Design a protein with these regions (language model features):
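Membrane-interfacial terminal anchoring regions of lipid-handling membrane enzymes
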Residues: 1-170
Length: 170
């Protein structure tokens, strides 16, 4: 829907490919070992999954930004790709291409594999992390999720394991 809105003003005069190629989309992926807002995100997702209304507090977004900037993130990686070359005249195909481009750049962290281990999610051990790095991340995640309601814990772990699962589909 967002791509359609971006193209809206020029839809009649220029094709999807030509327009998006003229904008020079450059994929960027930021990955970090730990998300300081992981519990907040899991709580919000859980409330929505349970069809409960989630009411943000007045300064919740501001607090999330502050926490995201100043909170513990462990290892951080920023990857900047090359301009995306659009070849299909479809918003859906364009969105998939953008997603795939970002995923290819995304650097997995020990916490991603540790979450898979905790969840018993199978993955290809296609990484260069030591057993100790994975173990340390696992200990961190186990402490982080201690005392959380099982549904919230599962959603938090999924935030970490999902990049491994999605990258394995590439």
């Amino acid at each position: 829907a967002l791509l359609k809105m971006i193209h809206l003003i020029n839809r009649k005069s220029i094709s999807i490919c030509d327009y998006f190629n003229s904008l020079c989309f450059i994929p960027i992926a930021v990955s970090y070992e730990f998300d300081p807002n992981d519990i907040f995100k899991a709580n919000e997702l859980y409330a929505l999954d349970m069809h409960q209304e989630y009411q943000k507090t007045d300064k919740e977004d501001l607090n999330s930004i502050t926490n995201g900037i100043s909170g513990q993130k462990g290892m951080v990686n920023l990857s900047i790709g090359s301009p995306i070359k659009f070849t299909k005249e479809s918003y859906e195909d364009s969105a998939k291409l953008i997603t795939r481009s970002i995923l290819q750049l995304y650097k997995l962290q020990p916490s991603n594999f540790a979450a898979c281990d905790i969840e018993n999610t199978a993955y290809k051990p296609d990484h260069n992390f030591s057993e100790q790095q994975i173990k340390s991340a696992r200990v961190y995640l186990e402490k982080r999720t201690q005392g959380l309601e099982p549904g919230i814990k599962a959603l938090l772990l999924k935030q970490y394991s999902n990049p491994v699962i999605e990258k394995s589909k590439l």
